[in-house]
């Protein structure tokens, strides 16, 4: 008995995400919501669809994968552009099955668990697509969110035309997934920057040195910033301030450029004339501290499992313009220096040090591929909490349609 208890504890449960169409004709099952982009290759979307044989009789069942970029501004149509652009679309027929395909371990376990009316599908990402990223709207913003999202859709239809307007909504189900990048195994050189400024009526310059302990940090990890100020001037450095700045370049449509502080720390330690100070300021950039501000998030599945966007890694030779939004990070250290008239003429000087912010590699990738059907835990694939105006309108339309059917 004790051995059985110990065995059950050693084998973790595996959450399977499911979602069922309104008319119960199709139910889609996925083993994860996040798919890892390893730069040279991306994890495929493997899952199964359970069909009701009576409700899909005479119909075909398809599963599609769409990557779309939303610009987010309703007034963009004034200049003749759509504020949604599909970057990639792929579709496979799962019922009736077309040829025999090899099954993944997850699919084998799910088919064994769910029974004979379960059909596998496999959708792959090309290597040129961006990762999931979203410009978090400010509270006063309305309209579509700006960003890149990925949608998996399963639907049953008796029409040869599988266009969006031809698919019966009651027989379709949609899930938003994320494509994310994890930190590379090799780090870059330790970030370091030096700067000097010459001031009026001072013979010697003000020196600033900024260094980080490493080039790559994980989400939620404290970032110690070592600052050395060598003040050879006749002025006083009154304040030292360090910021983590998120740099987002929207390259697909407009080349908009956003620089937003996502973490700030400062010290009131003064550096008098002809003296030196070395201090360390620790910063922790978190999306939780930036909820009410416009900024960049990793995607919009749920509030609780979304981080600040990871730094973008681009495959060598790839066209940057199709990446949608390029994200990078930098540490900015800013000095406030006294002037001739005190506070009235104080000036600020600053320098930046780039670094990368990413997810760590999974601890044991092989363990994630082992499935035991008795350890499956099925969870409804709920829509994300961060809904934009279009999605709310769409859900309301679906509910109204259901009421009339």
Curated annotation (Swiss-Prot):
**Phosphothreonine (modified residue): where?**
233
Q: In which tissues is it expressed?
A: Retina pigment epithelium.
Keyword tags: Cell projection, Membrane, Phosphoprotein
What GO molecular function terms would the record report? G protein-coupled receptor binding
Q: Name one GO cellular component term.
A: membrane
Q: Which SMART domains does the annotation name?
A: Arrestin_C
Transmembrane stretches in the record are none
* InterPro entries registered for this protein in UniProt: Arrestin, Arrestin-like_C, Arrestin-like_N, Arrestin_C-like, Arrestin_CS, Arrestin_N, Ig_E-set
Q: A GO BP term, please?
A: G protein-coupled receptor internalization
Q: Does the keyword Transport apply?
A: no
Q: How does it sit in the membrane?
A: Peripheral membrane protein
A Pfam family per the record: Arrestin_C
Where in the cell?
A: Cell projection, Cilium, Photoreceptor outer segment; Membrane
Homology family = Belongs to the arrestin family.
Q: What's the subunit arrangement here? A: Monomer. Homodimer. Homotetramer. Interacts with RHO (via the phosphorylated C-terminus).
Q: Which PANTHER family match?
A: ARRESTIN (PTHR11792), S-ARRESTIN (PTHR11792:SF15)
| Comment block on domains | The C-terminus interferes with binding to non-phosphorylated RHO. Interaction with phosphorylated RHO triggers displacement of the C-terminus and leads to a conformation change that mediates high-affinity RHO binding.
What's its job?
Binds to photoactivated, phosphorylated RHO and terminates RHO signaling via G-proteins by competing with G-proteins for the same binding site on RHO. May play a role in preventing light-dependent degeneration of retinal photoreceptor cells.
What is the protein's name according to its record?
A: S-arrestin
Can you name the source organism? Sus scrofa
* Taxonomic lineage of the native organism: Eukaryota, Metazoa, Chordata, Craniata, Vertebrata
């Amino acid at each position: 008995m004790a051995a059985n208890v110990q065995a059950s504890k050693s084998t973790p449960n595996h959450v399977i995400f499911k979602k069922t169409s309104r008319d119960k004709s199709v139910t889609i099952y996925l083993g994860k919501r996040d798919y890892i982009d390893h730069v040279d290759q991306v994890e495929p979307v493997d899952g199964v669809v359970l069909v009701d044989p009576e409700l899909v009789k005479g119909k075909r069942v398809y599963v599609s994968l769409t990557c779309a970029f939303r610009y987010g501004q309703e007034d963009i149509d004034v200049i003749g552009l759509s504020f949604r652009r599909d970057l990639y679309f792929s579709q496979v027929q799962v019922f009736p099955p077309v040829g025999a395909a090899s099954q993944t371990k997850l699919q084998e376990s799910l088919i064994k668990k769910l029974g004979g009316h379960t059909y596998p599908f496999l959708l792959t990402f090309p290597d040129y697509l961006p990762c999931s990223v979203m410009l978090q709207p400010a509270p006063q913003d309305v309209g579509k969110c700006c960003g890149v999202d990925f949608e998996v859709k399963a639907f049953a239809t008796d029409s040869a035309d599988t266009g969006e307007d031809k698919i019966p909504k009651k027989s379709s189900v949609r899930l938003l997934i994320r494509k994310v990048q994890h930190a590379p195994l090799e780090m870059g050189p330790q970030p370091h920057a030096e700067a000097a400024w010459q001031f009026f009526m001072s013979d010697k310059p003000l020196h600033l040195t900024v260094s980080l302990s490493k080039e790559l940090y994980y989400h939620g990890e404290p970032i110690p910033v070592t600052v050395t100020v060598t003040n050879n001037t006749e002025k006083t450095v009154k304040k030292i301030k360090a910021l983590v700045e998120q740099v987002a370049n929207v390259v697909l449509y407009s080349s908009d450029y956003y620089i937003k502080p996502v973490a700030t720390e400062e010290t009131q330690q003064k550096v008098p004339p002809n003296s030196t100070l070395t201090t360390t300021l620790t910063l922790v950039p978190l999306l939780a501290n930036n909820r009410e501000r416009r900024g960049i998030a990793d995607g919009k599945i749920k509030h609780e499992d979304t981080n600040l966007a990871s730094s973008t890694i681009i495959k060598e030779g790839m066209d940057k313009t199709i990446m949608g939004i390029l994200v990078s990070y930098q540490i900015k250290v800013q000095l406030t220096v006294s002037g001739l008239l005190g506070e009235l003429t104080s000036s600020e000087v600053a320098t930046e040090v780039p670094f990368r912010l990413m997810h760590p590699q999974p601890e044991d990738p092989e363990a994630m591929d082992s499935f035991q059907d008795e350890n499956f835990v099925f969870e409804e694939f709920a829509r994300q909490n961060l809904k934009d105006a279009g999605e709310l309108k769409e859900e309301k339309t679906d509910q109204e349609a259901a009421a009339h059917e």
